[in-house]
Each structure stands twice: as structure tokens, then as C-alpha cells.
Amino acid sequence: MHQYVTFIGGFPIRFYGIFFSLGIIFGCIMAYYLLKKDGRGWHEHVFDLGITIAFVGIIGGRLWDVFFFDWDYYHDHLLEIPYVWQGGMAIQGGVIFACVAAYFYLRKHKIPVLPFADTVTPAIIFGQAIGRIANFMNGDAFGHPTGANFGILYPDTTLAYRTYGAQPLWPAEVWECQGDLIILGLLLWYACFKHARGTTFCLYIMLYSLLRFFLEFFRGDYGSLAFGLKSAQLTSLASFTCALLVFILFSVKYRADTKVEETSGDPT
């Protein structure tokens, strides 16, 4: 892999920025398609909303990375915190901040939050999958050494090389990209069936949290935080638990409401 596409003067054009931008762009395109297919006219808001959540998500992803993953470095390099083009974005923080921004946007425009979220959820994970290619090209979010003669060898300009040298590393970013695409397929499959509002989004949170929790055992770019677990694993456990409880709550209510409707519709 290569970090740089070219240099314009002394300014580097990084593959990280290109693939990160492509993740946002193609995520918005997919969201537009899904919402237009849904037929409720919400697709007209995609690009305005996309700009909003992209901006807020970048801020959230950066702050999450700085304070939960790399504070040991950044507390001595505070001026580098805004340098997002160098890499260092936490997906979990980006998604959380983006969801908060999206909630207020949808409320302002009187768009039902849960149906909208369910419809665009596959686009979110699709954008994440492309974003992991950015991490791979940049040599961050890397795995720890495999301890064998197989694995990924990163260029000497990357953080992965500066951390572990010329040791083969587990392809953590590649596995997450592949896992995201599998989750995308499962979400599209689930959307084909009748289900309670909000459960598609909850399913996304649960599946991604599980994927992230187990992949963190292979990550080598930061250490454990508590109980032998990393910060992303603790966040994943909390996210999975909350999403599961909400999924069950929504599903039970949906079944109860459906039963009432069927009962009221029976001839007497």
C-alpha cells in the first residue's frame, strides 16, 4: 500500500483522505437511492444532512481517537489534534456524534427519526467499509504481530512500521472492511421482512459492536484500558447491550400492536 498519491508543492495528497471522502460520498449516494426507493420524499435531504453529519462526525471521530485511543501522544502534541488528514479517526466516536447531529436535523425538518434511520442504515455501514480502506492505506488501525512469516508488511513511513518495524501484522483493517460488507448484506436481507421501526438500526449497532469487539483482540495500535479490554471493546459491549435491549423492546411492542390490530380487524 502507499500513503501518498502525489505531492502538490510540498503538500501531500494522501490516499487516506481520498478513501475517507469516498466513504462519505458513496454512503450518501446509497442513502439517496434507498430513500428515493422508499418513496416518502426524504431523499431530498440526503446531501444537506450528509454535509452536516460529515462535519460533525469528523469532529467526533477525531476527539474520540484523541481522548480514548491516543491521548498518551496528543497530550504532548496538542497542536496536532486538528491534523485530521494525517489519520487518527475513531469510527465509534464519528457515528455517535453523527447520530446526534442527524437526530436534531430530522427533528427540525419533522422527519420521523426511526423510519429514516432504518432506511439509511445500510448506507452507514457501506461508508464505514470504504473508510477502513483509508486506514489500511494509511497504515493505522493496524493489527499486532502475527508471530509468524505471514501477515501485512507496512512501509517504513507508516505508524504501523514505527510501532513494530518490519514484522508481519494481522490485517485488522482488511478484516473489518470485509466484516462491514457482510453486515451490509445482512441488513439488506433483514430489511426485506416486516419488522418493528428502529430495529434495523439496532441490528446494525449490535452486529458492528460484535465485529469490533472480537477484532480488537487482533489490533495492535493501542493497549488495554481496563479489565484486559481496550476502550473500543468496552464501548462495543455497552453499545451492544443498549441496542439489544432497545431491539427487544421495539420488537415486543410491535408484536403486541400487530396482535391488537389483527384482533380488532376480526369480524364478530
Locate predicted features:
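A feature for loop-to-transmembrane-helix boundaries and adjacent hydrophobic helices
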Residues: 1-268
